[in-house]
Regions:
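Hydrophobic, aromatic-enriched interface-forming segments
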Residues: 1-43
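Outer membrane beta-barrel transmembrane domains
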Residues: 35-169
Length: 169
């Protein structure tokens, strides 16, 4: 489920959520024992803002995952640069830093990872790259080695002019 508000061609706000594992499937290997998979709730929100009379903007965001006793929050901000000077094509580059917080098994909140991200958008297509670097006590096991993530983005709304613009997140 996603709700968004578009102020103009470059500025928008979104808020959404999802619910997974509605039927709480049995994850036990023993057919006599029921071990139901916890349902998962996802809540996300963000903003895409271009400064007035500028090609620069900010794209802050947050996503929260809750599944049984587990909690994870990813939050951060990307700095966005509009590359195209004309109104006919949309080209943008963004990069930023995010942090992943999670609850500890015993108690408290743990700053688990620092996430460096970058993205290039052209019209309704985009390609992204991020690197998660472990900053918690788990870094001893990983030697600060993180993980790479690639993403491909396709916005269904095309470039045609509209009275209500499709947001570009």
């Amino acid at each position: 489920l996603l709700w968004f508000s578009v102020w103009d061609k470059n500025n928008a706000f979104y808020l959404g959520g999802a619910f997974s594992h509605l039927n709480r499937a049995n994850q036990s290997f023993d057919s006599d024992i029921y071990d139901g998979l916890y349902s998962k709730f996802t809540i996300h929100s963000g903003l895409d803002y271009i400064f007035p009379y500028s090609r620069f903007g900010l794209s802050p965001g947050i996503v929260t995952f809750i599944q049984g006793p587990s909690l994870q929050v990813n939050g951060g901000v990307n700095l966005k640069f509009l590359l195209s000077g004309n109104r006919r094509t949309y080209e943008a580059f963004q990069f930023g830093t995010w942090v992943r917080l999670a609850n500890k098994v015993d108690s408290g909140i743990l700053a688990d990872a620092l996430i460096l991200s970058t993205r290039f958008d052209y019209e309704q297509f985009g390609i992204g790259f991020s690197y998660d670097m472990n900053i918690s006590s788990l870094r001893q096991a990983t030697n600060l080695n993180g993980s790479f993530e690639f993403s491909g983005i396709y916005n269904i709304c095309g470039p045609e002019r509209r009275n209500v613009y499709c947001p570009r997140f």
